[in-house]
Every structure is written in C-alpha cells, then in structure tokens.
Amino acid sequence: MGQDREAMEHDCKFNTRLLHGETSKGYGQREILPPISQVSAFQYESMEELERVFTHKSMGYAYTRIGNPSVSAFEQKINELEGGAGAVCCSSGMSAITASLLAICESGDEIIAGTGLYGGTIDLLHDLEKLGIHTIFTKKLDKTSLTGLITDRTRVIFGELISNPSLIVMDVKEVSEAAHEAGIPLLIDSTTATPYMARPIELGADIVIHSTSKYINGGGNSIGGIIVDGGKFSWNFEKHTALKEFKKYGRMAFSVRLRTDIWENLGSCMAPMNAYLSYIGVETLGLRMEKICDNADALAKALDKEPDIEVNYLTLPGHPYHGYVDSQLGGHGGGILNFRAGSRERAFKIINSLKYAVIASNIGDLRTLVIHPASTLYLRSGREETEAAGVFDDTVRVSVGIEDKEDLINDFLSAVADSRI
C-alpha cells in the first residue's frame, strides 16, 4: 500500500494529490481533518520530558507561539503542494514577507524588488529602510536589469509571480538563473498564482510566500501567511552573515533561523482556528481556481469589447505577458483583472453601480470583489510610485469570484453603460 500511495502521489493530478497526498493519511484519532488544537500550552508528565522538547531532543509541542499541531498540519499540506523542504505559517501574508526578509537581511544589506508590488509590501520595504535594509526597485525583473543592479550588498531578489494588481509576470527561470549566478536567492510571493497555476520552486525559485488569506483559504474567513523553503539554495555564509550562526544546517539554514529565531521572536504565529479554516479551504483550491479563471477570462473579453474601457488581463491576446499563460501558468490567467475607466469619478460610478461585486479590499474570495486601489491600497504611496505599480486614478481592480459568468458579465456591462449617462 505504501508503494501504491507513493506512485499515486507522483502520477495523479492536482485535485487528487491535494486530497490524497502524504498529509491526508489521518491524524491522532484517525480524523479525516486535523483537529483544532485551540490551546496556549501543552502539558507533560515530567519536567525532564518538557526540557527535551525545548532542547529539540524530542518531538513535541510546548507553546502555540512556537508550534501547534493544527498549524503544523496546514504547513505540511502547503509544503507538499509547493514541493518544498519545509514551511512556516505566519499570522498574515505581510508577516510572512517581513519574517522572510529579516531572516536573510541585516543592516547594510540590499534587496532588489520589482516595482509592481502590492501597496502594503511597498510600504514594508520603505519601513525596512529605517532598519538599514535598502531596497532597489526596478521596473522589470529580468537578467539585463539584475546584472546592472546587483552589488556586493545584495542579499535577495524579491518579487511577485503575478503582480497585484498590475499583472506583471516574472520569468522565474530567467530571474532565478541571474540570481543564482550572483549567489543570491530568489524569493517569490505567489499569492495570486497559487500552487494550482504554478509551482515556483520547480521553476527555479528558492523561497515561496503566500498570503493564505486569499485564494488558499478561499472563503474570506481567516487571515494568514506561509513561507515555503525549497531547501535547494547553497548559502554563502560569508555573504549571508545573518545566517552564519546557522551554518551547520547547510541548505536549511534559512528555515532553521526563520523558525527558531525571527518568526518565534516576532510572535508571527498563525492561530490554530485560522490554520484549520484554511486547511479546509485549500482542499477546494483546484475547483475554485478553475471556475475563477474561466469567469475572469470571460469577463475580461466582454469588457475588452467596450470602446472606452482599457482592460488588463493576461489571457487577452495583446497582453505583454500573454506568452507566460501557457509557458509558466498552466494555461490560466488567474483571478484578478483590472480596467481603466477614464476618470476617478467614472471608476467610482461603475463600482457603486455593480450588483454582484462586493466593495472590499480582499482578493481570492468566492465572491467577486471590487475596489479602487489608488484611494485605498496605495493611499500611503506617492503618485509616481503608485503609477509604477500599474495603478492609476481611474483603475478598478476586480477579484473575480465563482458566480455564474453570465450574471457577472451582464452586471459589469450594465454598470459600464450606466456610467456613460
């Protein structure tokens, strides 16, 4: 049976692997789903036993801030989906990005990042400047730009696989090759792609981050983040001095420092209930993403026929990153599209006229969500920085849900038509 299961895990498709993989074999009392360990601490029969857990001589849990069975089950599930060597859950996607960068960088170090990042991530990178960690932004992450930007202080290349909301697609193979030639790891936020569309570690990335609050959870009922370490990067401990103390762990030095030092001391733990809710949510990821991507494609093509609407979606034939849909994203365009309405006033009018789109700041929900990003998500960013991220005063971002696509199309086309009056 063990050999049969191993063969199945290599040969089966996404949804089967998701439901019947290594992490779905049952738990302590043979539960189908991991139970919720909603506790602060764990008890032991003797002080010696607890000491062995604290000194990592025995497996076990002591305090939920540093480990919890419900959270571990979710970590293992996502780690398996991404093909990683280890994963750490965090309280949010922003917490995951923060912990990852602080585990690699220290004062005086540099990060190279794409400009098309989520507004909150840009704000974080500016905050890290106050700690002496400098970010060099580049309009396009590719081999040519990296060659001219990498210095002896560069410690990590960071970007989104599909940027939100500008929909710039990173060529992971090209960027990872350029990074590795310089002895630098590639850290990717793959929230908008999800493991359904792409597995960045297989493409060459070293570390993958998700805001699990989005597509992985899928129901908009919990906040969380996760960091997956591919365990393949050969760290130069003379260059990456933040990891020098963890040299004995070799290629897993990042993961060990992350879990036992930065993550633990920042208090970045995921709540057990949130882990449980996201574990349930991720099991329908394939079904949801198939429907979401189909809806987004249909809605984008319908809106693209409107003469006074400028639509941005990856499957549109003229899109500059259209080629990556098949080569890197499994034939899918994802769940986000955006369009320019011509003015801020018209953008607001369209948003306010929609019947089946909820005005909210999340993405990846079952419901279609809509927002004016310039006045919300990029409120703290300057105009130049906001426009570099592909966000303009007339931009409307749409996170497409699983509604019937005919209803969505009719709703958006009606709102666009009404906005002309």
What is the meaning of each model-derived region?
Residues 2, 6-10, 15-27, 87-306:
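Conserved PLP-enzyme active-site core in the AAT-like
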